[in-house]
């Protein structure tokens, strides 16, 4: 039975919590679509006419289900990474220690940088919907003109977000100029450590008379 270290417990909790938060956000987005988008697309579907119990169930079911699923998946993925073969377990612990040592500002900047494309995609979709809601109130423009106008607003916002992401990447590189080299060196060190450990165990097995199945099959007694 393996005794977990405090770093392993904290890393597992962090990965599970992150997966749960991502699932909750996705679930609330689905709930918002159910209550805001579907009634516009299907006028016969009117959530306002439903009872409070049904509306509550429709609202909390997607985030509850996705929170549980994503948290469980994150936990399983972490276990597979930590307790599988190879140097990935050391990489996961080193990454957790590095993240834990960062300041709140550095965590915020790195979090934005690591998820910038998700943020840009979500902001583009939100800006497209928001601009359509605003433009759709114009009684003069045709529907085609409204679509073009809403898309122009969304593209303008997306260009601004892309420029902001470039600036964010430059700022992060300025804060950590050798980050990529350090990570690459750490991976090589962990891989060498695992290789040395496997070689040591193999030598110990030979000294104690332990023979693997592959060695038994390749031995002379199995050959005609």
Curated annotation (Swiss-Prot):
Domain of life: Eukaryota
Mitochondrial intermembrane side of membrane: 1-13, 76-103, 174-184
Example GO biological process: positive regulation of protein-containing complex assembly
Subunit architecture: Associates with a subpopulation of the cytochrome bc1-cytochrome c oxidase supercomplexes. Associates in substoichiometric amounts with complex IV. Interacts with COX3.
Record flagged with keyword Transport: no
Function: Assembly factor that plays a role in the assembly of the respiratory chain supercomplexes (SCs) composed of ubiquinol-cytochrome c oxidoreductase (cytochrome b-c1 complex, complex III, CIII) and cytochrome c oxidase (complex IV, CIV). May be required for late-stage assembly of the COX12 and COX13 subunits. Required for the generation and maintenance of a normal proton motive force (PMF) across the inner mitochondrial membrane (IMM) by preventing proton leakage through an inactive population of CIV that accumulates when RCF1 and/or RCF2 proteins are absent.
Keywords: Membrane, Mitochondrion, Transmembrane, Transmembrane helix
Note: Present with 12000 molecules/cell in log phase SD medium.
Transmembrane region(s): 14-38, 48-75, 104-133, 143-173, 185-204
Mitochondrial matrix side: 39-47, 134-142, 205-224
Occurrences of domain HIG1 (ranges): 89-180
The protein's name: Respiratory supercomplex factor 2, mitochondrial
